[in-house]
Amino acid sequence: MAIISSLANQLLIAMPSLKDPNFERSVVYLCEHNEQGSVGLIINRPLQFPLSIVFEQLQIEPIRVEKNGLPLLFGGPVQPERGFVIHKQMGGWRSSLFLQDEVTVTTSNDIIRAIAYDEGPKDVLITLGYAAWTEQQLEREIMSNTWLVCPYKSEILYEVPFEERWEYAGLTLGIKMNQLSSDAGHA
C-alpha cells in the first residue's frame, strides 16, 4: 500500500462506527505522519481533573486562581503520564516542536510554570498521553472508514468548545456526523 501524502498538521475525525473508548467521537491533531507511523493528540476529551493537579505535583502556586481550572485533556492512550502543551508559537521553552504557524507542542515544565504565573501563551491545550499508529496502520484505518481527514482549522483547536469539536470538524467538511451511518461501504 502506498503511503497517503503526509497528513501531518491535519485533523482526524473518528467515524461514528469507531467504538474504541479511547477514540470514540474523538478529534485528533496529527503532529507527525510519515513512513514509520503517525503521532497525534486528541483535542476534545477533557479529563475529570483540572490543571491544579499538575500545579500541585510540580509544587507551583499559580498567581491567578482561574489557572487552576484550566482543563486537562486526554491526549491518547500512550504514555498517559506524559504531558503535552499545544500552543501558538511564543517563548523559548526548553523542549518545543514547531509544527506550523499556529501550532507548537511543548513538553517541558517551564511552560507549565509560565502558564501558572500568567506569562505563558493565551491559546493553550494541555494533554496527557498521545495517540500513535505503526507503519501503515493509520492508512489502513482511513481506508476502512475509521477516520475522516479534515484540514487544520485554528478555531477547532483553540476556540470551539471541547464537546462541540467532533460535530464542528465534520461540518467543516460539509458532513453532519450524527447523520452518518456506522455501516461502511465502498463503491
Curated annotation (Swiss-Prot):
This protein's source sits in the domain of life called: Bacteria
Instruction: Extract one GO cellular component term from the record.
Output: cytosol
Segments spanning the bilayer are: none
What's this protein's family per the entry? Belongs to the UPF0301 (AlgH) family.
Q: What is this protein called?
A: UPF0301 protein lpl0620
Origin organism of this chain? Legionella pneumophila (strain Lens)
What lineage is this protein's organism placed in?
Bacteria, Pseudomonadati, Pseudomonadota, Gammaproteobacteria, Legionellales
